[in-house]
Swiss-Prot record:
Function noted in UniProt: An essential GTPase which binds GTP, GDP and possibly (p)ppGpp with moderate affinity, with high nucleotide exchange rates and a fairly low GTP hydrolysis rate. Plays a role in control of the cell cycle, stress response, ribosome biogenesis and in those bacteria that undergo differentiation, in morphogenesis control.
Subunit structure: Monomer.
HAMAP family: GTPase_Obg (MF_01454)
UniProt cross-references to PROSITE patterns, sorted A to Z: G_OBG, GTP1_OBG, OBG
This protein's name: GTPase Obg
Amino acid sequence: MFVDNVKFHTKAGKGGAGCVSFRREKFILFGGPDGGDGGDGGNVYFKADKNSHTLSKYKGKKLLKAENGAGGEGRKKFGKKGADLVLIVPPGTSIYDDKTGELLFDLKEDGEKVLALKGGKGGLGNVHFKSPVNQRPEYAQPGLSGEEKDIRLELKLIADVGLVGFPNVGKSTLISTISNAKPEIANYEFTTLTPKLGMVEVDEFSGFVMADIPGIIEGASEGRGLGIKFLKHIERTKILLFMIDMSNYRTLKEQFNALKEESTKFSKNLANKLYAIALTKADTVENTDKMLTEFCDEFGFGSRQIPNEKGEFDKTKPVFVMQISSAANKNIKELKFALLEILKAQN
């Protein structure tokens, strides 16, 4: 099951207690103090691992805690440090303080590891409290409590290209055609129920990651449909690919305006993101060239942007508008190269 939002309480380990002990050896009846210190409590870490893809392992968990430190022992022996707790999460996981809403960490890279909570210090043994006026102290410190927090984890998948479109527009077909992703494909709405990532190989040395989310419907930004729940997963992408159905009963203009409106309402980040447009199912209708030209003319788009001298594109307009057909393999190769070219220009 795909889980992208979980809450739990986490606690670092408590420090072990210091030891009250006195030296006991043959012929030494009243030896001095030799109580050792307690071990420190274990820390809590979060670590991003590319082999982790969901937060499902933490669903339903109430408390996750590191190990407590062991108590000190006689003969000045230190207690063992408590084992650290390392919580593995997928890259793209944001870690929040659930009480304050503060963003604590944002793990984007594989292998990234952060210290979230420190374990408590171990208590001092009675060997530390010997003094001229107290040669046999019968006191040792208790260990200190470890830090604790209510934590919320939120996963936003990391991909280069994010697909945005209405249900049944052909997103799943496209990602299965040009990548290694194998989503369910059928002729009904909401075939895609969870986000999917696919690696697109353009040539022997180049490629990029594409993300498919459930279809957007009008009113998605207010919570209608499935798409709103997963729009956050394309916030990290470098470019959005708006997919518009050429065979739909609604005009290309109406579909595009609705998609832009929903993504803009959802977040400013999506509204200001670089985007391109793919006109899908071009094999199922006639006069596709005319439809493409009329669509671009209505908005004042060119079919392809040329970046400025700094390599920047105008984000208020699509980088390109291209008609495609996954079923007929029309312009699929051209689409891959066009997307790769844009991604390279962003680096």
